[in-house]
Amino acid sequence: MNWNQIIFISLIATVLILAIANEAESAAVRTDKSDIKREDGENMKKRIFMQESEATAFLKRRGRRSTKSKDEVNAENRQRLAADERRREYYEEQRNEFENYVEEERDEQQERNREKTEQWREYHYDGLYPSYQYNRHHI
């Protein structure tokens, strides 16, 4: 086939597809009933856009440089104080648990030392009280 014939056939196929697609009603966009589209558009505008006074009031309240209301400041402070209290309680609980652990370890260590000392004294006891080593009289 010649290049001219291939281009001609592809153009005819493209025109045919466009003609069929133009008459078919698409699911996304309707080609007729334009008055319904206008009414839907007005309803959509009312649902999407707010009145100018409401918009300016919203932007004044929420602007970056505008001051916060007392209620907003108080709410933020309450949240901050509650978070500080939770953090303080958590660290206090952790500190108490560690102190209890250290106290138990010290008690166990003291008990082991006392037992070792008693065993040493029993093993080295010579029948005298206090032991013979401390009762020597050097001449």
UniProtKB/Swiss-Prot annotation:
Q: What is its main location?
A: secreted
Q: Which residues form a coiled coil?
A: 70-123
Q: Where is the composition biased (Basic and acidic residues)?
A: 68-98
InterPro entries named in the record: UCMA
One Gene Ontology term from the biological process aspect of the record: embryonic skeletal system development
Q: Name the job this protein performs.
A: May be involved in the negative control of osteogenic differentiation of osteochondrogenic precursor cells in peripheral zones of fetal cartilage and at the cartilage-bone interface.
The identity of this protein, by name, is: Unique cartilage matrix-associated protein
State the organism of origin.
Acipenser naccarii
Upper taxonomic classification of the species?
Eukaryota, Metazoa, Chordata, Craniata, Vertebrata
